[in-house]
Amino acid sequence: MTADADTGMVHSMDESEPNPIPVARHRWKKLRATAVVLATQVAILAAFLGFWDYMTAQNRAAAFMFGSPSAIAGFLGQMARDGSLWRDTYVTGLETLLGFFVGNLVGTLIGLSLWYSRFVSRVVEPFVIALGSIPIIALAPIIIIWFGTGLISKVAMSTLSVVIVALVTSYKGAVGVDPDQINLMRTLGASKFQIFRKLVVPASLTDIFAGLKLTVGFALIGAIVGEFMSSSEGLGHAIFKAGSLYIIPKVFAALVATIALALILTFIVGKIERLLMPWRRL
């Protein structure tokens, strides 16, 4: 309740205005929970690295077989100084991004379009299962013969690693839409395309973005496998070359860069998800 200073009349507050106190408390609890999770993760990682470094310092054979965190950090610094870290990360990142984009675009469009026809989806299903069961590394020699040893072959490997997953997750989201909502739109006179555009696609976004996060790793694996088979640059080439020379710490250094790249790409996908689906922030 508020009082008017001039008239002395009492006015009630607008009940539609949100109370900032519960909102602030909710945000604080969420921030505190995130901080606790992050602190726990850092503690576990620090304990693991400390144990790893101690064991390799006590045993030369273990140091040769597994490297050590200090040696890995040394190789990371060396690779950063000579520029190979940034060059290889850029190459692998470009291949991964292109494969991620093309694979998800094609897979999502096909997956959503299968919602239109139950007959077509039943016809296509065994072929999708068959393609999804093929190990991507088995296709590498064929891809190299078709597209050569350059960028296109790595992008093709990355795309093939992604497309089936994107297709399945988007189709799952489309067919999982509440039938009652579809029937309601039909009774209101909506066409099939309007139902698809205004209901099916928005309702499928949760599954689509879950697939996007999952396919970041698949796209990166496809690019790395392509670099294993035939490449003179990239993180996959760095891992393969260091492994063939038994430089285990350098292998782990390149793996650390690969993990960092995957985390960055996943973080970007998460930001885009929260931008397009603001209700997911709650």
Across the structure, where does each feature detected by a protein language model lie?
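Transmembrane alpha-helical segments of polytopic membrane transport and secretion proteins
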Residues: 1-43, 267-282
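Periplasmic/extracellular loop-to-transmembrane helix junction in inner-membrane transport proteins
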Residues: 21-22, 26-30, 57-102
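C-terminal transmembrane helix and the adjacent membrane-cytosol boundary/short C-terminal tail
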Residues: 118, 175, 206, 252-282
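Transmembrane-helix boundary motif in ABC transporter permease subunits
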Residues: 98-128
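Short cytoplasmic-facing helical segments at TM-TM junctions of multi-pass membrane proteins
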Residues: 126, 169-214, 235, 239
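Transmembrane alpha-helices
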Residues: 156-160, 192-226, 253, 257-258
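Generic hydrophobic transmembrane alpha-helix motif, especially the helices
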Residues: 129-165, 172-173
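Hydrophobic alpha-helical elements at and bordering transmembrane segments
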Residues: 85-89, 93, 123-130, 170, ...
